[in-house]
């Protein structure tokens, strides 16, 4: 087995319990297995959500069945839409969860850091903790952060810190910052169309800005 799955998203029970208590986005309905990040980003997929929430032990079984040696775990969407205080807390707990999995199953799990990008100073501290203390491989960043792209000057300290740690930057798609993509649901805004467009925009902005 030498396959590495780096598109390995997860949720963990405590976070989903919290999402299920919320009455505003992001929120989770356990009865219908529906996660709503926004009006145009709704995941109603019981099978998929069940796998996102599965235990690390269950992941190991699935990995063995499919010949996957390692998963690089990354927190699925939601915490970046919380308040700064909540985002900091849940990013820390998510990264702790991944590190516990790395210790419990050596060589089977690695991690992309979850960072509370609404607070850059807190993100820098958390990135240090993940890269120095946990030996994560890098940071998974959304292609945009709701009102800004990763080439924005405010995120440069994070990119510089990541480079200092020789960490990988995984730019993950999300719905574009474009009103033309709203109002028609995930079919337009998400994976079928919007995701690919937004990653392309993010990459081209970084290239034109001189990030690369």
Predicted regions span which residues?
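Helix-coil boundary/capping segments in enzymes
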Residues: 1-212
